[in-house]
Amino acid sequence: MSDVSVPLTFSDVAAAKVKTLIAEEENPNLKLRVYITGGGCSGFQYGFTFDEEVNEGDMTLVNDGVTLVVDPMSLQYLIGGIVDYTEGLEGSRFFINNPNATTTCGCGASFSV
């Protein structure tokens, strides 16, 4: 996939954290899978998990040697978004800066469109 048509951004900070976590797990086949499910206080919620598989139709992005995977259904809600990572007083977490979200919950884990 060329950079011109990439509908989602995988930040350098998030990629660095994924790289660290993969090294800790000692499994170079792991990829960060981002997905959307129904639920949460705003209607949809973000999910993050490690996966060794890339399914047919999945979009992949590579940054700093690590791979982000998104299924087609989830991608439609994430177009134009940024997958990022933060560490602060509230803890550390992956999050998505999603321009499609019309409302988000206080913790940023769920949204509506």
Curated annotation (Swiss-Prot):
Name recorded for this polypeptide: Iron-sulfur cluster insertion protein ErpA
Assembly: Homodimer.
Gene Ontology biological process terms from the UniProt entry: iron-sulfur cluster assembly
Co-factor: note: Binds 1 iron-sulfur cluster per subunit.
Recorded superkingdom: Bacteria
Keywords: Iron, Iron-sulfur, Metal-binding
Encoding gene per record: erpA
Binding-site list for iron-sulfur cluster: 41, 105, 107
Protein's UniProt keywords contain Iron: yes
Pfam families assigned to the protein according to its UniProt record, in alphabetical order: Fe-S_biosyn
Family affiliation: Belongs to the HesB/IscA family.
Gene Ontology CC terms: cytosol
GO molecular-function terms, A-Z: 2 iron, 2 sulfur cluster binding; 4 iron, 4 sulfur cluster binding; iron ion binding
NCBIfam families: iron-sulfur cluster assembly accessory protein, PRK13623.1
PROSITE patterns given in the database record: HESB (PS01152)
Cofactors (names): iron-sulfur cluster
Keyword Cell inner membrane attached: no
SUPFAM superfamilies: HesB-like domain (SSF89360)
Organism lineage string: Bacteria, Pseudomonadati, Pseudomonadota, Gammaproteobacteria, Vibrionales
Organism: Aliivibrio salmonicida (strain LFI1238) (Vibrio salmonicida (strain LFI1238))
Function: Required for insertion of 4Fe-4S clusters for at least IspG.
